[in-house]
Amino acid sequence: MTKSGSKSEKFLLIDGNYLVHRSYYVSFKFKNNFRSTIYLFFQTIIKIIKNLNPENIFIAFDEEGGTWRHDLCKEYKSQRSKMEDEFWNIFKAIREILDSINLNSGGFRGHEADDVIATITSKFKDENQIYIFSRDKDLLQLIDKNVYITHDNELKNLISIENFYQNFQLEPDQIVDFKAIAGDSSDNLKGIAGIGEKGAKNLLNNFKSLEKIFDSLESTNLISKAQKQKIRDGKEQALFLKKIVTLNKEVPMKLEKELFAIKININEEILEKLDKYDSRYVLKQFEKALESDDYLW
């Protein structure tokens, strides 16, 4: 089954890594982590689709191996522990299920899921509405007039261009500069020493961009002498970091619109194949949701 529509359509782009992790840690409330994670993963997608009713979907994942960021910066995410065997098995099972039912998903070797989402967003945002499901702050740089981000299944707390400054005291196009100055401990990236998040926001509110901070450094009275020296000392690091945290919007992936139309293929043969994951119940729910009168295409 496939959904198609008017020129302006809704794209649902899901950060698959985030959703698997979230489902996994919530699953500890239940007895069977493996089965519960798979169930929660697909239940979340069902809820989002019901609330958003998108015409198009893509679930983006990181692929195995390093990325161009690791090539540039050996310290990038180096502090993160390796996946536990149980989690890795669940991750692979979810990927297999998605492939088996033909729900649009994947990644691109050498790039992160964020880059894939950025590429799809850049391609389609001018004439469509893009809804990104993630809690990854790197994706905030993509917010635009037709681009929204949420991690709420009910879509009640959308981050949009209208409420962005209220939430972050920055504009979306300042996010990469903010991270370049303040660093990002979650990715093991050190910014300009001694500035911090509050200092980074103050600088960007006064000077708008990293480059304008450097251009104004010797003439402005809005930066203390001590802070000026910190900025001089950290200039090269900040410029380097900006390259690392800027999402690549040109991942060489296929971008024909029809490839993103919601379509699934769930039949008895596929269900039997996937019975090893005890996923029949939630997949039947998924199929039923997509075939209901409210969401029929």
From Swiss-Prot:
Its EC number is 3.1.11.-. Keywords: DNA-binding, Exonuclease, Hydrolase, Nuclease. It is an enzyme of class 3 (hydrolase). Residues 171-262 form the 5'-3' exonuclease domain. GO terms for biological process: DNA replication, Okazaki fragment processing. GO terms for molecular function: 5'-3' exonuclease activity; 5'-flap endonuclease activity; DNA binding. InterPro entries: 5-3_exonucl_a-hlix_arch_N, 5-3_exonuclease, 5-3_exonuclease_C_sf, DNA_polI_H3TH, FEN, HhH2, PIN-like_dom_sf. PANTHER family: 5'-3' EXONUCLEASE FAMILY PROTEIN, FLAP ENDONUCLEASE XNI. 5'-3' exonuclease acting preferentially on double-stranded DNA. This is 5'-3' exonuclease. The gene is polA.
